[in-house]
């Protein structure tokens, strides 16, 4: 399952991207769970409480308050595994997007071919990461522990 976040201050843009993602993933027979956020602050607040529960985030750059680039920098400080894609009408930020390790940069309005390409890369990266990490869930969230850092497992009455 691919867990996706869409962060855009435009409800219309979120709805359109959500519909496109659902259509494209349905064609690929990939289950998805999509979360919507109207601000960078909302996204960061949710991610703080739900660590590791989103795999891929589509971010608008120009938003009121915390913009998408600032949100991406904060997200990147918390996780290198989270995949970031900028969806914006501005070309000025292309190089900034790659500085935070963005998976892609899509111009508005997004086209199915562009989003399909991003999904192909996101799914390939997720598949590759699944071989490299051990997923562990506890009351604080979902954690991806690199397998190479695991020395042993210990279970206490479980």
Predicted regions and their residues:
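Conserved binding/recognition cores within well-folded domains
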Residues: 116-158
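Hydrophobic residues at beta-strand termini and immediately following loops
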Residues: 37, 106, 145
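Conserved sequence signature across two-component system core domains
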Residues: 7-8, 37, 57
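Non-catalytic signal-transmission and effector/linker regions of two-component phosphorelay proteins
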Residues: 1-5
């Amino acid at each position: 399952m691919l867990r996706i976040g869409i962060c855009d201050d435009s409800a219309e843009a979120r709805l359109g991207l959500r519909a496109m993602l659902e259509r494209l993933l349905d064609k690929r027979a990939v289950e998805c769970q999509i979360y919507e956020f109207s601000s960078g602050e909302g996204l960061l607040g949710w991610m703080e409480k739900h660590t590791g529960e989103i795999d891929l985030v589509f971010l608008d750059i120009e938003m009121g308050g915390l913009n998408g680039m600032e949100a991406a920098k904060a997200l990147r400080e918390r996780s290198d595994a989270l995949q970031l894609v900028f969806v914006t009408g501005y070309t000025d930020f292309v190089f900034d997007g790659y500085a935070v390790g963005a998976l892609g940069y899509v111009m508005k309005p997004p086209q199915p071919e562009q989003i399909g390409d991003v999904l192909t890369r996101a799914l390939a990266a997720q598949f590759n990461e699944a071989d490299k990490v051990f997923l562990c869930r506890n009351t604080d969230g979902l954690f991806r522990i690199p397998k190479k850092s695991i020395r042993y497992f210990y279970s206490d009455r479980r």
